[in-house]
């Protein structure tokens, strides 16, 4: 059995965090080496509630000042001693078993798969920039390649729930020099990596109406290669969309 560390980032959304962890513990049937929860709200009341509810289940990391999501991830990944990480956010509800095993089967089929999205195609396609390749299978596990529509340059990396290889993380020098997932994705794309989405979804996005602003994430103004500037109509959606 491959050794995996669980890392979850959270920022003050206790109700969503509880739903996420309750569903994860209900459906996960894969033995994990270590479980970390890093909380970035810098709110002592939140810290106390999380400690009371989850202190016996996970190793809790409470930031002493707000660091933002990416910095929190970088600091937590320094503690990881396993080749694989199951990365998770605080606003996803798990709906079935074997999702970690299914991720592993898919990622083992091609070292250039950077991650496996566990949500449905309908959920991922709320912003109409994705297309999906033909159905592929590893054993009984189906998946499709995620493709950005012509001109769009991202779609290759996300902090959505799923397996990440520590070797892939180290390949680009970690995330410390990046301000957003878009630029991380562009870097992986240059190296020939791509993303896939599972055919049998295992999570539901429950965070749409509870977006948390993160001033440390600097979103580039570019969105579509060669397109004129001023995509203001999409800007609001892009900032709240999950990558």
Regions inferred by a protein language model and the residue ranges of each:
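Short, acidic, metal-binding catalytic loop of nucleotide-sugar glycosyltransferases
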Residues: 22-32
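A conserved acidic beta->alpha catalytic loop
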Residues: 37-47
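Conserved donor-nucleotide/metal-binding helix-loop-beta segment in metal-dependent transferases, i.e.
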Residues: 97-118
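N-proximal low-complexity "stem/linker" segments adjacent to membrane-targeting elements
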Residues: 1-22
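Glycine-rich, basic loop-to-helix element that forms the pyrophosphate-binding segment
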Residues: 64-79
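Short beta-strand-to-loop element that shapes/binds the nucleotide-sugar donor at the catalytic cleft/hinge
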Residues: 116-131
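Short beta-strand-to-loop acidic/aromatic patch adjacent to the donor-nucleotide binding site
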Residues: 83-93
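C-terminal catalytic/acceptor-binding lobe
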Residues: 19, 154-243
């Amino acid at each position: 059995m491959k050794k995996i560390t669980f890392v979850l980032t959270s920022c003050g959304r206790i109700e969503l965090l509880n739903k996420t962890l309750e569903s994860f513990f209900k459906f996960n049937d894969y033995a994990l080496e270590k479980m970390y929860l890093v909380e970035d709200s810098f709110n002592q009341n939140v810290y106390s509630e999380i400690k009371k509810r989850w202190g016996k289940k996970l190793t809790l990391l409470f930031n002493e000042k707000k660091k933002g999501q990416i910095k929190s991830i970088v600091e937590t990944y320094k503690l990881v001693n396993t080749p694989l990480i199951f990365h998770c956010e605080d606003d996803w509800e798990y709906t079935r078993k074997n999702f970690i095993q299914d991720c592993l089967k898919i990622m083992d089929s091609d070292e250039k798969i950077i991650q496996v999205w566990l949500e449905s195609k309908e959920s991922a396609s709320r912003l109409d920039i994705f297309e999906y390749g033909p159905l592929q299978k590893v054993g009984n596990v189906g998946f499709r390649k995620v493709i950005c529509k012509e001109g769009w340059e991202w779609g290759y990396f996300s902090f959505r729930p799923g397996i990440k290889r520590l070797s892939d993380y180290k390949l680009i020098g970690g995330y410390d020099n990046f301000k957003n997932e878009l630029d991380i994705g562009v870097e992986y794309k240059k190296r020939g990596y791509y993303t896939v989405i599972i055919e049998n979804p295992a999570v539901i996005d429950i965070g749409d109406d509870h977006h948390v602003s993160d001033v440390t994430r600097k979103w580039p103004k570019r969105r579509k290669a060669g397109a004129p500037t001023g995509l203001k109509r999409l800007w609001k959606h892009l900032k709240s969309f999950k990558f």
